[in-house]
Structures are given as C-alpha cells and as structure tokens.
A protein has these predicted regions:
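Short, acidic/polar
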Residues: 1-8, 255-266, 326-334
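Aromatic-lined substrate-binding rim segments of carbohydrate-active enzymes
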Residues: 2-81, 234-235, 239, 488
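Acidic (Asp/Glu)-rich catalytic clusters
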Residues: 3-8, 49-50, 130, 263-268, ...
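Hydrophobic faces of well-ordered beta-strands that scaffold small-molecule active sites
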Residues: 14-16, 55-59, 137-141, 248-250, ...
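Surface-exposed, active-site-proximal loop segments in enzymatic domains
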Residues: 20-38, 68-78, 94-109, 153, ...
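Substrate-binding cleft/loops of secretory-pathway carbohydrate-active enzymes
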Residues: 65, 144-158, 235-288, 319-323, ...
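Polysaccharide-binding and catalytic clefts of secreted carbohydrate-active enzymes
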Residues: 77-264
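Carbohydrate-binding surfaces of carbohydrate-active enzymes
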Residues: 196-205, 212, 216, 230-232, ...
Length: 642
C-alpha cells in the first residue's frame, strides 16, 4: 500500500536505507531475510519494481535515518580502533538522541575494513538487482559525510591513522623538508624545522600572523582530503561488491560550505553530489536556499548532471523543531526557483521517529499529498527539467576563504554549519583577530559577500554563488565574476580569473587586493592585477566592502554588460526566471519569505503576455512588460509565462 501511494504522488523512484546495524547479527554474520522476513531488502526492491518504481539504495555505512548510532553497529562505534580521536586522544562524542555515541574515524583502517565487509555481504543479495538487470539505478555512498557533525577544525581527527594520512598529505603537497619549513616560517636548517615524519597537527587556533595561518589552513585542507579518501574507499568497496554501472551519489548537509566537504575532491568517487534541505519558511531561509542551490545548479549544469536534492524535508524528526506543510512547500518551491531539477522526498511515508509525511504508515494519503500531485503535473506541463536559470553574475568564494573561516571559528565544537543553517556567518561566528593585517579578514570578507548579494538582489540581477573548488567548471558563461579576497589568492585561481578576463568576462576582486597566496603563503611573484582589467578599460579591479562602492559597481555592471534584471516592488519579493533552449522565458517564480501579505509588481520583459499559476490555476495579464499579483506571506508562486 505504501509503494502504491508513493507512485500515486507522482514519484518514479523509491529511496531506501539499508542499515548495517539492523542486518548484522554478529561480526561478519548478516541477515537479509533468512531469519527475519522484515530484513529481506531484496524482496522490497523486487516489489518496488513490480509497482513500476526504480530504486536508490543507501547502505552507508553512516546513514543517520534518525537511528541510534546512525545505523552503525554498537560494537563498531565502541571499538577504540574505530573511533575518531580528539586532540587529547579521547573519543569524539556526538550528543545525539536517543543516546550519545563516539563517532567513527574516517581514517581508521579497522572501520573502513568493517564497512567493506558489510558492503560485500550486501552485494551478494542486491548486486543482481542493479540496472539493467533490476530496478536499482543509483547507490548513495555514506551520508552527510561532514565528520558526523563534529566538524570543528580542532574537534578531530587525531586518530593514529589520521595522523599518518596528514603527514602523507604534507609530503604530497610540499615534496621537500625545505619547502615545508619555508611555508611554515622556519629556517630549514634550524633545530625546530618541521619534518614530515613527526610533525604534529595543530590542536587549537593560535595564529598571530599570516605566516602562522599556513599550517592551520593546511589542517583544514587535510580534512577535505581525509573525507575524499574515505569516500573513495567506500566507493571502491561497493564496486568490488558488484554495484557497478550505476551512478554513485552523496548528500551534502545543510550548511555544507562551512564543513570540510569539497565537491571537487570527491568527484572521482561520487558521480552526483546533491544537497539536503530542511527549512522553516522565512526570508532567512530563502536567502540560504538561494546561496546553496545556485551554487549547486551552476556546478551541475556544467557537469551535465541534474541539480538534485538527496533529501528535501516533508515532515521532521520528533527531536527537531517542527516543520509544517507550509514550510515544506516553501522549501521545495524555493529550491526549484533557484535551479533544483530533482528531489528525494524525505519522508514520503511516515515511520518511527518521523512526523508529518504525506503518506501515513498504512499507505493512506494525507491532505498534504495533494500538493505533490499538483507539483508533478506542473513540472511536466512546462517540461521543467529541460529549462535553466541564467545566472550571468557569479559570486566566487575561494576554498581558502572557507578554510580560513573554519579555523577561525569562535565556538569550538558548536559546528559552523549550525550558524550557517541559522543564517549567520563569519561575522557572527568567527574570531575578529586581525593577525597583524590591520583588519579582521574573515569578518570583512563575509561583510563584502553579504553587501554584494543584497545589492544584486535589490536590483533583480540573477546571480549564483560559486565555490573556489569549482573554478574549472562553474565560471563558464559568466558575464561578471566577483571573487572574494580578504588579502590572499592562490596563483592557480588567479590564472583562471585572468583567463576569464582575457575571454571578455568582467572580473572584480574584493574587498582586499591579494598580496599573499590563498593559504596566506608568500607569493613568489605578486599578482599582476592589470591582467584582470583586460578588455574593460576603466574598470576598477578591486572593490571595497562599503555599501556605496558596491552599489556603484553593481549599477555600472548592469549598464556596461547589459545585464537583464527582474526587479520587484516591494523589494522583499524575489523573482527567478527559467528559460528554454531558445532563451525564451518560460517559468517565473515569485517568493515572499516575509510575514507580510502584499501585492507585488515584477518586470518580466517585453515577451510574455500572461502568466498562469501552475499550482492554483489562476491567469494574470502581463501589461507593458510587468506583472502584478498578490503574494501571501511565506509563499511561492510558480507561473508559466505565455
């Protein structure tokens, strides 16, 4: 009944966890239905196929799923050899309901081998059901792999296997002891010069100068390498278990930009990086969704894969703040507005430790189900998966700026991702240390980003965020690239920006001119900023953070580059437009995240003559290139333009 109801919602694929802890009876002994019929996951997969559904499998090893120990066997999490370690060598505890537990180490060879053994056993029952022989069309590797939410820069991982990987990371990066010593500000011939074989990672933030920052930024980068290596090990184990010929996915958690997850680094093992979304309807949530989804969308478009939400909330766990149906509808429509092209409804069917799904545990539809039926019909009507949101402006945040914010986080084990989810950033959560620069770098950079984003939104300029790790895929097609610099910029990224400038793209840096490398190492040669001026005579390459300068730069770019705008009145309403392959505007989203009920006016250009609300069935005329209609508080309208 539950599968029938899922199909009736308009969903084509069912996503299922396979919890290691549920299937393990003893070390190396697994039950996939031979003893307990409820554990027959292969039967469930075959039944889904009979119903015309395809299947995504999520075997972890970390699955969360609101399960105790996140689906990892108790014997594994309490095995000292498997546990992540704090700077003092203690287990790293996650204070999670119903019971706190020590999180596994992504570097632990014992843990990685234990997970591989589970995958091999699972492959014996599910690999024969992989497409095209069966309905399994994708497999997810791990889950929200941000160090089990204990992702503070100095929380972990000081496990012996992690320390060994850290030292190898430094060998690979610096090649020689002389280069390592020079990078860390030591005399290579001095008695205190660091050595690859016994160097210890930093255990707290103690930098007092840009030179001191280098080893801290390296430690933050190592976390990214650690996770990427673990994902590769998991992916290899799944391949060895027979899960071949289908894409592998991984879901980044809310606040992913504040974690060590790096989409570019996992690209070798993960085919589809998606995001998870859980939000209360609000203007803050809209801004967060815009930032996250625009970054995801431009990356995925460049890579030729759909921008996918691995989880988008329909309901909530009982130990989280409640999300009602309006919150879920607002979140889903806002993600679509900023470029999402597919989503996994979490949860479609209610279960233990979950409240508010559109289908009850007996397979009966709740009133909430009607929205999803209407949404599927609306998406099909406009062929939404073949439309795209043009974003001629790209706000580029280099990876080293994000690493710097991680190591300067001021709240210890309280994850920076928590602040990000709440709409806060470096201004609220990072140390204001000036490090001898005369200004607080991460705070000033965050202020610059917010000021620029606000100015672009007020004028209705479509833009997207880009992480520096995506510099090789997410900058093509941009008319204006604004790259954040708090005083440092890597030579590699500078060359990429210079190439864009040579191709005619307007390139701006701000709020500071970069005099150091991205990790705050001294540059062998200063950046020649004149190379960024290129074809745009009179263009000021470096833009300060003061609002008046930012406003002037945005106004100038609109005129100079003839940027299209979708300005709204009042300006707390936001518009996004999606075009077809011919560049014709086909779908307009209007978003009101505030508490105010309003009549809004939006400029849509000379083409459209009417707008049809795809969810409510109402038609509105477009007069003189403008559309006027009512938008209720905390709602989104999805309109087909004709």
């Amino acid at each position: 009944a539950c599968l029938d109801a899922t199909k009736a919602l308009g969903l084509d694929v069912v996503d299922t966890y396979v919890p290691w802890s549920a299937h393990e009876r003893a070390p190396g002994v697994f039950d996939f239905g031979s003893h307990d019929p409820k554990l027959d996951v292969a039967h469930f997969v075959r039944l889904a196929a009979e119903k015309g559904l395809r299947v995504i499998v999520r075997p972890g090893p970390h699955i969360n799923a609101e399960l105790t120990h996140f689906g990892i066997p108790e014997r594994v999490v309490w095995d000292p050899a498997c546990q992540a370690r704090s700077p003092r060598g203690n287990p790293v505890m996650l204070p999670m309901l119903p019971v706190a537990f020590p999180v596994p180490s992504y570097a632990s060879e014992v843990f990685l081998d234990e997970a591989s053994r589970f995958f091999r056993a699972l492959g014996e029952v599910l690999a024969p059901l992989v497409h095209p022989r069966g309905p399994i069309v994708m497999i997810q590797v791990d889950n929200e792999g941000a160090l089990y939410f204990r992702d503070g820069a100095y929380d972990q991982d000081y496990h012996p296997d992690a320390i060994a990987l850290y030292r190898q990371f430094l060998r690979d990066k610096y090649k020689s002891l002389d280069d390592l010593a020079a990078a860390y500000g030591h005399d290579p011939s001095g008695a205190d010069a660091p050595r690859f074989g016994d160097i210890a990672p930093p255990t707290r933030f103690d930098a007092e100068s840009p030179t001191d920052l280098v080893r801290h930024v390296d430690w933050a980068e190592f976390h990214e390498v650690l996770l990427a290596k673990a994902m590769q090990r998991f992916a290899n184990a799944l391949t060895d278990a027979g899960f071949t010929g289908i894409p592998r996915s991984h879901n980044f958690p809310p606040g992913q930009e504040a974690t060590p997850l790096n989409a570019a680094r996992v690209r070798g093992s993960i085919d589809l990086v998606g995001y998870d979304y859980y939000s209360k309807a609000s203007e803050t949530a809209r801004a967060i969704i815009a930032r996250r989804t625009s970054e995801l969308a431009v990356r995925c478009e460049a890579l030729g894969v759909p921008a996918f939400a691995c989880e988008i909330g329909a309901g909530f766990p009982p130990f989280f703040p409640p999300l009602d149906e309006r919150d879920s509808i607002f979140t889903i429509l806002t993600t679509l507005a900023y470029g999402l092209r597919g989503f996994n409804l979490y949860m479609a069917v209610e279960r233990d430790r979950w409240i508010g799904a559109p289908i009850d545990p007996e397979g009966r539809e709740r009133p909430f189900a009607l929205f999803f039926k209407k949404l599927r019909a609306a998406l099909d009507r406009v062929d939404f998966t073949h439309l795209y949101r043009r974003a001629p402006v790209r706000l580029l945040v280099p990876r080293n700026e994000r690493r710097l914010a991680r190591v300067m986080h001021a709240f210890g084990p309280v994850s920076a991702a928590f602040f990000s989810v709440a709409g806060a950033g470096a201004r609220e959560a990072c140390l204001e240390d000036e490090l001898g620069l005369g200004y607080p770098p991460v705070v000033e950079a965050d202020t610059f980003v917010r000021t620029l984003a606000s100015s672009l939104e007020q004028r209705g300029v479509p833009f997207a965020y880009v992480g520096g790790e995506d510099r090789d895929v997410s900058l093509d097609g941009a008319s204006w690239i604004v790259c954040v610099s708090s005083g440092g910029l890597s030579p590699t990224l500078f060359e990429r920006l210079a190439g864009s400038a040579d191709a005619g793209t307007l390139v701006t840096l701000g709020p500071r001119s970069p005099s150091l490398g991205g990790a705050r190492r001294s540059l062998l040669e200063p950046h020649d900023l004149e190379r960024l001026r290129s074809r745009h005579a009179g263009h000021e390459v470096v833009l300060g953070a003061d609002p008046s300068s930012v406003e002037a730069a945005v106004a100038s770019a609109i005129t100079r580059l003839e940027l299209g705008t979708y300005a709204c009145d009042p300006d707390f309403v936001h518009a996004t437009v999606h075009e077809d392959e011919a560049g014709k505007a086909r779908v307009l989203f209007l978003i009101n995240g505030t508490e105010r009920d309003t009549n809004a006016r939006v400029s849509v250009g000379p083409g459209p003559t009417e707008a049809f609300d795809l969810l409510k069935g109402e038609t509105f005329p477009v007069r003189d290139g403008a559309l006027e209609l009512r938008i209720k508080p905390k709602t989104v309208r999805m309109l087909a333009l004709g």
